[in-house]
């Protein structure tokens, strides 16, 4: 009997990379593997994608793990470097780095490096989080072009704030700012992440940066979901029934007695809970798959267990398989039911959840 286990489907991951190439055929792809590859395993994910043009990470430590694991493709530090003392390592490991503020620029100008580094100047086109403001961007760019520690030409990157809201006008405005600044400049350009790839083909440019969609999960809050775009879920969160019991009409279930059965039924208990990272906020009615059949969660999610209503005629037994999300049950459905984003669901699973890789 298997308790909480994440099953990672390498074949689906490779399929999704190919699907991204179909959607952005003129662009190279930075496969974003930050946050332990969105919960899928940093090194295993990168090794599964030898055809990725580059990888994107949030921390230098992630990049160094990839290099130590034999990954030779370009690796982009999406948030840049946090300490000037990291620059010699970035140079020696042939890493690419975003540069988005005056402190980073000054550090690049002051350091002595054996080899220059490849730089992506981050332009703030409307996210207002990281990046150089448009009115300061030209002077910043010129300093980078004259910096001996920067490999030329300087590349330009930005990030959409509302790519998943195609009617709001914000993305067009960001594109206008980005295009105006990039005009006539020789470096590579990148602004599209998952939402841009799916909804804004005019934003694909030289490089696109698929994140959550690489793993078969849509960045959109509502339908269409990943499978609707031709992607396959890479992660399946699975477990088993540890008990099946008769349950009488009128009896409550679990802490607080928040769910009371209206009929005699069969109740299943699943070895899964918020101690594994499953959302405690999941309400009664949230679906799971038992033996491939959709059944509802009933009562509160506990630390180690979830109860499900198997139905009065159920023939399920202890030890039978359960899928909490993944193949046959998109995680986007769970996100919609629980009001917890799919990003958070797949990245917050705890260390007691086993990981298994299949082809």
Curated annotation (Swiss-Prot):
**Coiled-coil spans in chain:** none
Asked if the keyword Cell wall biogenesis/degradation belongs to this entry, the reply reads yes
The PTM N6-(pyridoxal phosphate)lysine maps to 34
Q: Which cofactors go with this protein?
A: pyridoxal 5'-phosphate
Per the Swiss-Prot or TrEMBL record, the active site comprises 34 (proton acceptor), 255 (proton acceptor)
Activity response to pH changes: Optimum pH is 8.5.
Reading the lineage from the top rank, the first entry is Bacteria
Entry EC no(s): 5.1.1.1
Write out the function statement from the record: Catalyzes the interconversion of L-alanine and D-alanine. Provides the D-alanine required for cell wall biosynthesis.
Subunit record text: Monomer.
The protein, known as: Alanine racemase, biosynthetic
């Amino acid at each position: 009997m298997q308790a909480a286990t994440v099953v990672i489907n390498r074949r689906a991951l490779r399929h999704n990379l190919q699907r991204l190439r179909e959607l952005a055929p003129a662009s190279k792809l930075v496969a974003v593997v930050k946050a332990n590859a969105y919960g899928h395993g940093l090194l295993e994910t990168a090794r599964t994608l030898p055809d990725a043009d580059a990888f994107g990470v949030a921390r230098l430590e992630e990049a160094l793990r990839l290099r130590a694991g034999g990954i030779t493709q370009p690796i982009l530090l999406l948030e840049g470097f946090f300490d000037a003392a990291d620059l010699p390592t970035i140079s020696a490991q042939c890493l690419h780095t975003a540069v988005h503020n005056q402190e980073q620029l000054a550090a690049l100008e002051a350091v002595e490096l054996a080899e220059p580094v490849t730089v992506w100047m981050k332009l703030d086109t409307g996210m207002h989080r990281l990046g150089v403001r448009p009115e300061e961007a030209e002077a910043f760019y010129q300093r980078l072009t004259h910096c001996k520690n920067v490999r030329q030409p300087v590349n330009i990157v930005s990030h959409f704030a509302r790519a998943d809201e195609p009617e709001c006008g914000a993305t067009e405005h960001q594109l206008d700012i980005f295009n105006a600044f990039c005009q006539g400049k020789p470096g590579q350009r990148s602004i599209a992440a998952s939402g841009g790839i799916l909804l804004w083909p005019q934003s694909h440019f030289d490089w696109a940066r698929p994140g959550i969609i690489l793993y078969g999960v849509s960045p959109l809050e509502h339908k269409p979901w990943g499978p609707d775009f031709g992607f396959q879920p890479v992660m399946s969160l699975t477990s088993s029934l540890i008990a099946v019991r008769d349950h009488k009409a009128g009896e409550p279930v679990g802490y607080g007695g928040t769910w009371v059965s209206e009929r005699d039924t069969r109740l299943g208990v699943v070895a899964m809970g918020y101690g594994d990272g499953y959302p405690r906020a999941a309400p009664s009615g949230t679906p799971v798959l038992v033996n491939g059949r959709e059944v509802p969660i009933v009562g509160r999610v506990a630390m180690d267990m979830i109860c499900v209503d198997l139905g009065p005629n159920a023939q399920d037994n202890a030890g039978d398989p359960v899928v909490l999300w993944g193949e046959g049950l998109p995680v986007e459905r769970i996100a919609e039911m629980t009001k917890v984003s799919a990003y958070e669901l797949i990245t917050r699973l705890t260390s007691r959840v086993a990981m298994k890789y299949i082809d």
